[in-house]
């Protein structure tokens, strides 16, 4: 049996208090590039990804800052668009009437994460911050010790996937992120110095270790979606087991229509790089989603997908899946 390491749990009641506790316990000074086990303090919401990682000793924080008692952490509120607090569970997001009616891609993505039990615990904020994955990293401590570790936990070791690579190639696998990028979402982040808003795509960088482009003392507070009038969206994914697994490749697409003509379009892909890939979808603008326009957009996705041999599926399978699932997504939007 894999057991959790010892840690101390602190339970703030406000976002500001949570950010302050992170800084007080050394988050700002910590550097995950020194190896994931070196991080002294971490946030926990649902814990559906963090606790298994801790059991495998991928992380061994001395302090966990729980968001479970933060006031308003699970609110979903309508305005000109939609604001979702980071503590809202994936089930709450997937079944919210406004999400299912106006933001279909998000409802589909949130509903495609793992199993119902884990969606009842896992949060939208946790999915945004989901750790990158790799077959060399997501193993027990015993397994990794026998193999000599990898760059993500021990930076002095080469990347086992590509030994000549100067960076970790672990893959981004969150389902909700491409959906939110395709929907034009912004994220609110807070630290001890205050709050700021970012385009969601700015939250990530192409690095399997330091995959978040925010500080270790930053807290994701909420995600805000713009008004979806005139937009259609969808999310589709390929995975080993259709009831449980992370995406081998996942594609979110959103188009704004004037009649049947596309006036704006966004496509984002997960599971094919260390960050979610926002794809240039301008080839769709001005079209009526004819087959040749869809094929052109799918070709852009195919060329921009650069999976490595580090998760389920072969490289060619994942790259082809990105193309095929883009075509499926766009056809479903055309025929809706």
Question: Each predicted region: which residue ranges?
Answer:
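C-terminal structural segment of proteins
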Residues: 1-336
């Amino acid at each position: 049996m894999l057991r959790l390491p010892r840690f101390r749990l602190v339970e703030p009641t406000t976002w500001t208090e949570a950010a302050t506790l992170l800084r007080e316990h050394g988050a700002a000074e910590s550097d995950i590039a020194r190896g994931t086990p070196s991080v002294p303090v971490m946030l926990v919401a649902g814990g559906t990804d963090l606790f298994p990682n801790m059991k495998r000793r991928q992380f061994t924080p001395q302090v966990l800052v729980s968001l479970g008692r933060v006031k308003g952490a699970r609110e979903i509120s309508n305005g000109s668009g939609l604001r979702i607090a980071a503590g809202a569970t994936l089930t709450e997001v997937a079944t919210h009437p406004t999400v299912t009616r106006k933001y279909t891609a998000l409802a589909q993505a949130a509903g495609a994460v793992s199993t119902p039990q884990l969606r009842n615990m896992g949060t939208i904020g946790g999915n945004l911050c989901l750790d990158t994955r790799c077959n060399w990293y997501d193993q027990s401590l015993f397994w990794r010790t026998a193999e000599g570790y990898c760059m993500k936990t021990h930076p002095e070791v080469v990347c086992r996937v590509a030994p000549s690579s100067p960076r970790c190639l672990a893959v981004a696998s969150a389902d909700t992120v491409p959906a939110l990028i395709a929907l034009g979402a912004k994220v609110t982040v807070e630290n001890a110095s205050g709050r700021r808003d970012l385009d969601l795509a700015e939250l990530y960088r192409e690095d399997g270790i330091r995959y978040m482009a925010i500080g270790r003392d930053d807290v994701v507070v909420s995600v805000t979606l713009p008004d979806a009038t005139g937009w259609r969206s969808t999310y589709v994914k390929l995975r080993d087991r259709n009831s449980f697994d992370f995406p081998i490749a996942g594609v979110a697409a959103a188009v704004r229509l004037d009649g049947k003509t596309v006036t704006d379009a966004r496509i984002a892909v997960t599971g094919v790089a260390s960050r979610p890939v926002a794809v240039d979808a301008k080839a769709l603008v001005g079209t009526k989603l004819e087959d040749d326009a869809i094929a052109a957009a799918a070709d852009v996705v195919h060329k921009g997908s650069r999976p490595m041999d580090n998760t389920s599926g072969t490289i060619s399978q994942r790259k082809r899946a990105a193309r095929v699932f883009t075509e499926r997504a766009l056809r479903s939007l055309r025929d809706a």
